[in-house]
Amino acid sequence: MFRTMMRAKLHRATVTEANLNYVGSITIDEDLMDAVNIVENEKVQIVNNNNGARLETYVIKGERGSGVVCLNGAAARLVQPGDKVIIICYGLVAEENIHKQEPKIAVLDDDNQIIEMLGAEKAGTIL
């Protein structure tokens, strides 16, 4: 059996743009993608801390070092520049490997720069 487990997360990313007329997706600074091993065209879930909206889309590489986090297409209706979002990527893990798998979590500042890298989350942690 396989289970769907969180494998990567960009925590408290700041939305820099919302582009309604783009075809779709989320554009993410490639440095941030690399930090948590998210690849172009990979499916991600976005959770908006400001309004509670949750959506799924795919990733497009953004310019390295730019801090860009841009929701494109229909998703742009669910965010505003300045909103705080959590970007989560899941993967299928075989039952026997569940306890060996540890997610990569990058905690970001207001400029989408990494301030901390975490492994497994602990209950009660407030960031």
Curated annotation (Swiss-Prot):
Job of this protein: Catalyzes the pyruvoyl-dependent decarboxylation of aspartate to produce beta-alanine.
NCBIfam families: panD
Cofactor note: Binds 1 pyruvoyl group covalently per subunit.
Protein family membership: Belongs to the PanD family.
Cofactor list: pyruvate
Designated name of the protein: Aspartate 1-decarboxylase
Post-translational modification: Is synthesized initially as an inactive proenzyme, which is activated by self-cleavage at a specific serine bond to produce a beta-subunit with a hydroxyl group at its C-terminus and an alpha-subunit with a pyruvoyl group at its N-terminus.
Record's subunit section: Heterooctamer of four alpha and four beta subunits.
Enzyme Commission number: 4.1.1.11
Pathway annotation: Cofactor biosynthesis; (R)-pantothenate biosynthesis; beta-alanine from L-aspartate: step 1/1
Recorded catalytic activity of this chain's protein: L-aspartate + H(+) = beta-alanine + CO2
Pfam assignment, any one: Asp_decarbox
Main location (coarse class): cytoplasm
GO molecular function annotation: aspartate 1-decarboxylase activity
Pyruvic acid (Ser) sites (modified residues): S25
SUPFAM superfamilies on file: ADC-like
